[in-house]
Regions:
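N-terminal cationic-hydrophobic initiation segments that often serve targeting/anchoring roles
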Residues: 1, 91-93, 318, 351
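Bacterial Sec-dependent N-terminal signal peptides
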Residues: 1-16
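Zymogen propeptides
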Residues: 12-246
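Second-shell loop/turn segments in exported
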Residues: 71-77, 250-254, 332-336
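Short, functionally important structural connectors and interaction interfaces within domains
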Residues: 201, 217, 253, 284-285
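Beta-propeller domains
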Residues: 225-277
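Extended C-terminal subregions enriched in glycine
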Residues: 254-373
Length: 373
């Protein structure tokens, strides 16, 4: 993929925006094409009452063949921290330049594993990176931005995850998720892969078994795949995850399903993800909260969290032009020159700029808008 910067043009046009009942004069401080199908605009918005906001947004044309999207993990690890700029510079390579990005999911800010590794940076919600499943589960508190492998059908909504494992005798067991931290309670079957820690970080007492994909199979959504046991089950807990394989963990009645397997046994697994009743096939998935704009209507989100109803730095990802355009937008805040905004205000501004659906990313001090010419 070749990405280049088209000649920039400074602009000083002024326009009026009515955001949640307040009139703002918006002066365009900067407008440029950053790369194929991608523009960036910077606005200074001022109200008659003296409120001022610096706004940075980008519009990305999904139909442009030279553009692709990726979720990027800090240090390419399940747990780890890294700035958006550092991620972009580190991931760029000849033929593929990461030139635009915003912060994403809420994440763990404390804690260590049983072996002493930091949990800081673990995503709270489901996450898929270039088709690789880093985390999957049904999380009704979080909203996902999802894009398929063809850069088509972008969707924002709450993902309902379902999974099923079937052994050779036809016995089935529901799969609760992938790479879940501290599983507890009830009957749970969880699959751990190479993107987790090198071990499952689970307590003793449940059942675990190391497995690998059968030849020619892929660990993906929407298509059944076969896995083969490579060892006998164990109840010791905290099992090492094979570099080229998986660990299947069973708790409660699901432990019996795991214990019934022996080395060489095969199971068939399938994962499905649905948003608003529609099956999705995530190649890129990022979680956050809240879903602030839905079908062109600003949603009531300020009551959900105190910070949502106060002026804060905010970042959002949005869909426009019937799914042909993705928007990134950040409003600076906690500054003498930029007040920040409420969740309903960033949603209303995105609506005025043409978006129909939006999700707020982790905002406040995490809000970041990075671009490189």
């Amino acid at each position: 993929m070749a990405l280049g910067c088209v000649a920039a043009m400074a602009a000083h046009a002024s326009i009026q925006y009515n955001v949640r009942g307040t009139e703002y004069q918006a002066d365009t401080l900067f407008h440029a094409m950053l790369g194929p199908g991608t523009s960036q605009t910077s606005l200074l918005m001022r109200s008659a009452e003296g409120r001022q906001m610096y706004v940075y947004y980008a519009k990305i044309d999904l139909t442009n063949p030279y553009i692709s999207f990726s979720t990027v993990m800090g240090q390419d690890s399940f747990a780890g921290t890294e700035t958006v700029r550092s991620m972009s510079e580190r991931k760029s390579r000849p033929g593929a330049r990461y030139f635009l990005g915003v912060n994403g999911d809420f994440y763990y800010t404390s804690g260590t594993t049983r072996r002493g590794d930091s949990r800081v940076g673990i995503p709270i919600g489901p996450c898929v990176v270039d088709g690789e499943i880093y985390k999957a589960n049904t999380n009704t508190d979080f909203t996902q931005f999802v894009l398929d492998a063809n850069k088509q059908n972008p969707i924002i909504g709450c993902t309902k995850f379902s999974g099923l494992a079937t052994n050779a005798s036809g016995k089935t067991c529901g799969v609760d998720g992938v790479n879940l931290v501290n599983p507890s309670g009830g009957n749970r079957l969880i699959i751990y892969n190479k993107h987790f820690f090198p071990y499952t970080d689970t307590p003793a007492g449940a059942a675990e078994i190391a497995m690998k994909l059968a030849d020619g199979e892929s660990f993906v959504f929407g298509k059944p795949f076969k896995m083969v046991a490579t060892a006998a089950p164990s109840t010791a807990g905290d099992m090492d995850i094979p570099a080229d394989g998986f660990v299947v963990y069973g708790l409660g009645a699901s432990a019996d399903f795991v214990k019934s397997l022996k080395e060489g046994d095969e199971i068939t697994v399938e994962f499905h993800a649905h948003i608003d009743g529609k099956e999705v096939f995530p190649h890129t998935m990022m979680s956050s909260w809240p879903n602030s704009l839905h079908n062109g209507e600003v949603t009531d989100t300020e009551y959900l969290l105190e910070e949502f109803g106060s002026n804060q730095p905010v970042t959002a990802v949005a869909i426009a032009d019937e799914g042909k355009t993705i928007m990134f937008l950040t409003i600076d805040g906690r500054s003498p020159i930029s007040s920040g905004a409420r969740t309903t205000e960033i949603a209303d501004l995105l609506r005025l700029l043409g978006a129909t659906d939006a999700v707020n990313m982790d905002s406040g001090g995490s809000s970041t808008f990075y671009s490189s010419s």
